[in-house]
Amino acid sequence: MATSRIYSRTAGEIIEEALRDAKIIPAEQPVQAVDYENGLDSLNNVSKFWQTKGIHLWLQERAVLPLVTGQKVYELGPDGDPCGYEDGFYSTELDAAAVATDTTLTVDSTTGMVEAPDILTSSAVTSTQDWTSVNSGVLTVSSGIVITNSGANDGGADYSLDATVGVTYRVRFTYTKGTSAGCVFSVLNSSTVEDTVTLTASASGELTITAPVDTITFRARNTSSTSGETSTVAALNYVDEDSGSRIGIELDGGTMFWSYVLDVDSATSVEMSSAITGAAAIGNQVYSFVNQIDRPLKLFNATYASSITASEIPIDKWSRQEYTQQPDKTSQGTVVNWYYDPTLGDGKLYVWQTASDVTNVLRFDVRKALSVYSATSDELDFPDEYLMALKWSIAADLGPSYGVKDNRQIVLETKAAQALESALDNDNDLGSIYLAPNWSGG
């Protein structure tokens, strides 16, 4: 029999173990939904409390922050300044000059760049099931959705797309010309057309819409009203234009323009979701990364480099008082000090001095927050060696709510404390120890 070195548990499994070991739920009795809900609350309480308890090595990652000339404060988190995890952070250079309004760039390499994924999980053109006939159009399938006029009507077809209000989407399609003179393609907010194009020859097209509601409609409609004339929707794709890699381009004016990768056209060509706002010369820096960092609980091991490929220089951590007492917070030069304030929203990183060039970067280790669990099927965000401590800690946390007797509660709390201590003993970053004489004589 094959064996594994990984022992994984779901939230529901660890909650059930805790309930049974605490003698709250008998072995022969099924766990009820309300008990799972209580267990999820306890699991989240325990995991968030544990964030105060040590290093948690598995929650540490190295991050890269491109600096902005003269900027003294950076927001770190999902809605903060562009900042990615180092293992998914890529750099390249422009291989051809770009001008304002360009959306397609030629670069040395598109390695690591991820284009916006198709939201549709299955082909929309292999069945008429999710399509709705418009104006008596007859729908069939033959190398796509075939729209046939019924009588003297310009027949059409609608396809509903789930959306998030405020998000901008690209609806892409391939049209095969039939006997109809052409076809009108549109995206609609209810009955309001937000974007439209008419094609009279086989081609691919793209429509853009910023969703004002949670359902939008793609419509294809023949331009001809002659009975029996046809058009075919051969392909349909649907993307959130801001779901690809973040991409930053150094502009000649000394700033960094940020957008999202829409398409990776080739090994050296990339299309962005928005046009650059200024000129960029051959050799200018290009950054890309997939995952914006989460709000860090802590920062440490920070280094500064004059460029992404330059040598890193360790920089010193300041206290809040040391930063606030610095009289000239806007002076530019080499960054030598930093202070981090982990606010409840995006965290705030203060640097001194401020960057003197748009190619300057900081790197630092971040400690991420533990996951919040909302379903019993969620995989636990803990290494194997923490599962025992987690089980007993959940049991101890649930005990008072279920009226566990005092002597049993003491046992649960003792087991929880001992298991957590053992787990924390294993959760440390062993390094060098330096001994030096005490020259002060104290």
Residues covered by each model-derived region:
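Glycine-enriched, solvent-exposed interface loops adjoining structured elements
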Residues: M1-V99, T104-L105, T110-P117, D240-G442
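Extracellular and organelle-lumenal recognition/adhesion modules and their flexible linkers in secreted
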Residues: P78-G80, G88-S91, D95, T104, ...
